[in-house]
């Protein structure tokens, strides 16, 4: 792990909150040393020309399912942190260790195993065999022990799956309201956030009554109501809409335009390009239109919206780690966020909501996770894919494709 010193000079800076048209950013020993109007460099310090470019904080994907080699794929597209929302601890332990030691991988936080019931989501999507590999919550008495076990595994937050399947054309059991509330309370007792997987408006209402801190999907079975928007605002929750995955589930949107984009295609293995170009096609009664409208209205009301993709493994179609984040930003803009607001949803907002105080902004003393792009994504969001440089803890990434097209098959749910 090297520790270089350099400056990025005469660059437009989006610092996670606002745009500064002309700055110089000084990085030393993996941290941002200074953000100034001018900098008198010496011959010993590398100077990166930022003219015509925009410097962003490294992107934070607020909903993934991390598995080797997803952290490498994520970083290739400027995602410097993934927030995993359901993974087996055996896989996560190694990924945490590698991310702590290496700067060619994105960092990761995890919910470990999500709380669901026997036969509940995601069993209808991944099959009985995979679903049976995970512990479930069988009764109210299990709630405290389930949360304690996840905390012992290293969970950074606790996830509840409140989903009866109706938005996806299924009918499956789900957590009861008393059990969900007990899980959320137990998470808070351990000093952890509780986040809720929902796909229906009724599920969202139940999650809010249970006391979750955030919803990690937007409901899409029906249009939003004034009541649900008021409840979300009153509860102070954030919402990660995962519009990329909602589009795939509702068979409306896939990642074909990303797979075929000349800025991305050379860096995406063939198996992942194929994955991007498909939808789940579940024939669900839900609609991406409902989710986009709900995102728009929640955002207008003042609910914090975070950017997340729900990217998982091969077989979880419609998304891919890293590159799908750029498509998600486009969808957030389609849902009514300005480009600057969409960029906040991928940087400072998730950092604040998930307690990542060392990242998500460009400011002195913070970690030098940086994304340099050609053009101005604060005006045209698609410019985020015109990548000119990526730094992880101050080390510049060499953007080359992975050595192999070998990828993990589906072993974790898209939830």
Q: What role is predicted for each listed range?
A:
Residues 189, 275-281, 288-376:
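His/Asp/Glu-enriched, well-ordered alpha-helical/loop segment
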Residues 11, 327, 338, 346-348, ...:
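C-terminal cap of metal-dependent C-N hydrolases
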Residues 208-215, 234-238, 302-303:
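Glycine-enriched alpha-helix->loop->beta-strand junction motifs that scaffold or abut catalytic
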Residues 71-193, 228-266:
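Divalent-metal coordination cores built from histidine and acidic residues
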Residues 72, 204-211, 245-265, 291, ...:
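Histidine/acidic-residue-rich catalytic or RNA/ligand-binding cores of hydrolases
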Residues 1-6, 13-56:
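Histidine-rich, glycine-flanked metal-binding segment
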Residues 57-67, 187, 193-199:
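Histidine-centered catalytic micro-motifs
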């Amino acid at each position: 792990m090297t520790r270089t010193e350099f400056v990025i000079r005469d660059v437009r800076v989006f610092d996670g909150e606002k745009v500064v048209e002309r700055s110089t950013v000084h990085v030393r020993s993996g941290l941002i040393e200074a953000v100034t109007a001018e900098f008198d460099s010496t011959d010993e310090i590398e100077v990166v020309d930022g003219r015509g470019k925009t410097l962003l904080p490294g992107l934070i994907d607020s909903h993934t399912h991390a598995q080797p080699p997803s952290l490498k794929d994520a970083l290739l597209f400027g995602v410097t942190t993934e927030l995993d929302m359901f993974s087996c601890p055996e896989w996560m332990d190694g990924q945490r260790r590698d991310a702590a030691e290496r700067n060619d991988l994105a960092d990761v936080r995890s919910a470990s195993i999500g709380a669901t019931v026997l036969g509940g989501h995601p069993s209808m999507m991944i099959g009985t065999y995979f679903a049976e590999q995970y512990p479930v919550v069988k009764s109210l008495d299990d709630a405290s022990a389930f949360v304690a076990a996840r905390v012992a595994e290293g969970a950074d937050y606790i996830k509840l799956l409140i989903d009866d399947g109706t938005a996806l054309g299924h009918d499956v059991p789900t957590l009861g309201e008393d059990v969900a509330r007990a899980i959320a309370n137990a998470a808070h007792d351990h000093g952890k956030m509780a986040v809720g997987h929902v796909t229906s408006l009724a599920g969202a209402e139940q999650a809010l009554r249970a006391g979750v801190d955030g919803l990690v999907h937007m409901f899409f079975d029906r249009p939003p109501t004034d009541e649900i928007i008021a409840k979300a605002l009153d509860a102070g929750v954030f919402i990660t809409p995962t519009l990329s995955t909602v589009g795939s589930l509702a068979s409306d949107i896939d990642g074909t335009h990303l797979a075929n984009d000349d800025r991305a295609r050379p860096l995406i293995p063939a198996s992942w390009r194929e994955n991007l170009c498909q939808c789940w096609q579940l024939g669900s009664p839900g609609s991406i239109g409902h989710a986009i409208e709900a995102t728009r209205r929640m955002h207008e009301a003042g609910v914090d919206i975070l950017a997340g993709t729900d990217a998982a493994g091969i077989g979880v179609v419609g998304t891919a780690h890293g590159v799908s984040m750029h498509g998600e930003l486009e969808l957030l803009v389609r849902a009514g966020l300005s480009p600057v607001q969409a960029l906040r949803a991928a940087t400072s907002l998730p950092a604040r909501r998930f307690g990542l105080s060392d990242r998500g902004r460009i400011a002195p003393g913070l970690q030098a996770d940086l994304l340099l792009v050609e053009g101005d994504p604060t005006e045209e969001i698609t410019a985020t894919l015109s990548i000119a440089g990526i730094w992880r803890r101050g080390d510049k990434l060499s953007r080359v494709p992975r050595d192999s097209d070998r990828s993990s098959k589906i072993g974790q749910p898209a939830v």
